[in-house]
Amino acid sequence: MEYSSKLRFAVSCSSNMNRSMEAHGILKKRGFNIESYGSGNQVKMPGPTVDKPNCYEFGPTTYEDIYADLTNKDLHLYTQNGLLHMVDRNRRIKSRPQRFQAETREFDIVLCLEERVFDQVVDFLNRSVGKSGNPVHVINIDIEDNAEEATFGAFFVADLCEKLERSEDFEEDIDQIITDLEENNPKRNLLHTICFY
């Protein structure tokens, strides 16, 4: 696929279901070179009760599998709470949830959508035996895990990506771009660090 962006972006939430997929969809429509991931051990989604989540394995499980499973378990519940709508959106963007720690491709920028995910991604990158030595900028943007915040947050992520993409030298400008966004959005908990592949 041809991308209009020069930078390689990744976006990660915990399960590659809600926040990262909302951002992936918007960035993909805008022509960014974007991939999305989860950083957790499993794909976890709300179940019939708080103590009974629906859990799926990263790797073999497709969004189609998840859609069929939720439909078979309780069509009414998962239609009412929006999960089927969310999974339907996801299967139109890509085939399956992916785990960041299983990815071998390199990115220029990894956007994490909560601090716990940021910590997991940074820990993974710092523990990995580097091959290329290429830098990767890891940025945290806190986005609450619900449909409305995922949408607002995705536009915030897209705004950040557009600013980075337009920069003549994003490596030089990234700190100022983040500082400017943080001043206008103090609740987003923007964090930034550099790791190496």
Curated annotation (Swiss-Prot):
Changing S39 to F/E: Suppresses the locomotion defect of the kin-20 ox423 mutant. It comes from the Eukaryota. The keyword Nucleus applies. It is found in: Nucleus. InterPro entries: RNA_pol_II_suA. May be phosphorylated by kin-20. Changing S39A: Does not suppress the locomotion defect of the kin-20 ox423 mutant. Expressed in epidermis, intestine and nervous system. Pfam families: Ssu72 (PF04722). One of its GO terms (cellular component) is mRNA cleavage and polyadenylation specificity factor complex. It catalyses: O-phospho-L-seryl-[protein] + H2O = L-seryl-[protein] + phosphate; O-phospho-L-threonyl-[protein] + H2O = L-threonyl-[protein] + phosphate. It is an enzyme of class 3 (hydrolase). GO terms for biological process: mRNA processing; regulation of locomotion; termination of RNA polymerase II transcription. Keywords: Hydrolase, mRNA processing, Nucleus, Phosphoprotein, Protein phosphatase. One of its GO terms (molecular function) is RNA polymerase II CTD heptapeptide repeat phosphatase activity. The modification Phosphoserine is found at S39. Its EC number is 3.1.3.16. Protein phosphatase that dephosphorylates 'Ser-5' of the heptad repeats YSPTSPS in the C-terminal domain of the large RNA polymerase II subunit ama-1. By regulating the phosphorylation status of ama-1 and thus ama-1 binding to specific polyadenylation sites, regulates alternative polyadenylation of pre-mRNAs, including unc-44 and dlk-1 mRNAs. This results in the tissue-specific expression of unc-44 isoforms. May interact with synd-1 (via C-terminus); the interaction may prevent ssup-72 binding to RNA polymerase II ama-1. May interact with RNA polymerase II ama-1. Belongs to the SSU72 phosphatase family. This is RNA polymerase II subunit A C-terminal domain phosphatase ssup-72. It comes from Caenorhabditis elegans. The lineage of its organism: Eukaryota, Metazoa, Ecdysozoa, Nematoda, Chromadorea.
